[in-house]
């Protein structure tokens, strides 16, 4: 269980002393090794984003949770969807698109290549701006991604000697959580599932580790826990042999996560997620319905408004 106690004092000072830049010119963008920068440098850069009004979105998932493809699908929806079919919102990358890593993702998707997973000790920071065509409110977000192996170190599942990156991530997350962060908690359907309702060892491990992460926040840093939101994302949803509601699946296969979701409903959301057809390292077809639902949910959480006006939702 991660312990975040005693990690907030330094980070709050950085945030309060930082002036907005409003130009997207941050020192740390794209993919980097955590060891490249000191805690001070990383926290200052995050503080600049917070001062600029950016909402911090942190995907959390174990290895093989589909986190890299989840992020790729979000970028695909933002910049590769058919605007004739869906022109509900616009996206932009502040600063240098090449440095941000967005172009690298788009180039891979154009070749139908699956993106490689984030490696241990890596950190990827991607800034995006989103606005609805029907609203004046724009949201500015920062996607902050760490490897599944480092998430395992946070939850205590991985107990090797290399805990340096995990300790650094704890400091980073403490700063993020204090500024209304949103955790996208990815938990995949077991690809070997035979029958809905029979929890496998895979299900139990996923349930235990993701619940450990969340309860670690609540018990060791309750004030930080109360300032964040959790969006539970059931990835690889297309692998289910039988259709059930996301709530029912969570209850049957992630029971402790379901207890969190149902007991603290004001802090939680839940969506099923599928990126489409992937065979090996090749994307056969990417489906953009799931990323659209994610972006719509995110916009509503950040603004209190739906991307679409009521009349558009009725007739679309």
Sequence positions of predicted segments:
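Switch II of P-loop NTPase G domains
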Residues: 120-130, 136-179, 192-194
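A short hydrophobic beta-strand->loop->alpha-helix junction that borders the nucleotide-binding pocket
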Residues: 91-94, 146, 187, 274
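Short, flexible boundary segments at extreme N-termini or domain junctions of P-loop NTPases and their
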Residues: 1-60, 64, 215, 219-220
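Extracellular structured ligand-interaction cores
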Residues: 54-56, 125, 138, 227-229, ...
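Short, hydrophobic, well-ordered secondary-structure elements
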Residues: 63-64, 71-75, 141-144, 177-188, ...
